[in-house]
Amino acid sequence: MKVLSFIFLFSAVIFGQVINKTPEKKIVYKYADSLQAIVVTTKDWSTVQGTAQLFERKTTKSVWKSVGKSFPIVVGKNGLAWSQELNELPSDTNNGRLLMKTEGDGKSPAGIFMLTSIFAATERKSNLPFTKLKESTECVDDVNSASYNKIVDKFQVGDYDWNSSEKMLSVGEQYEVGVFVAHNSERQKGGGSCIFLHIWKNSETGTAGCTAMEKSNMEKIADWLDAKKNPVLIQLPMDSYKQFQTKWKLPKLKS
């Protein structure tokens, strides 16, 4: 993981308005140490349906090999938006405008993100840090909270300073098992929060910003992920995937 020194001047669309923004230096997750990757691609920025494929490699110098068959997923109800953590920009923008991921935009983040923990409604074996959901388990989406973009137990966090959160156990079947996606890991205010892999409502309905799939595939992912292999989610529209495939050394997809 390296800090890149290039600074780009670009136009971003936030809350429907185009603004000029010069980003500070950001960390790009090159996942040099990753041995597991979940690749999610969509047709374009606005498409809700997409495809996921698992990959693994034996060493950091090995070629990525696909694991099992690809399967369908859905992303945010409004498609994808570029993560503010990345300072390299895609060329396949929407009419020259680049949508950046923001809180409450109904879009899933595009980029490369660590997969850091698993949650479930019941106890289960896990090779990632595990959280069993309780009535008091919440993911905080209040941008003014010190716990913004964290899964917490409201009775143990200490400073209960938020006015908005997701009561995870009450979500029901869609959160029977899921994975925390470390998007906005620096917890930049308004950069987006509570992004998960989880079970979908159905194959047509987009999410509030997560990536969702059939229960059997979510279970398979939860059993497969291993913290020792530094797993990542690589999530991009197909044209952006092709743009960065060589530079970021992304897994080769079947045509």
Sequence positions of predicted segments:
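Cell wall/extracellular polymer interaction/catalysis modules
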Residues: V18-T207, S216-S255
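A conserved hydrophobic position in a structured secondary element of the catalytic/binding core
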Residues: M213
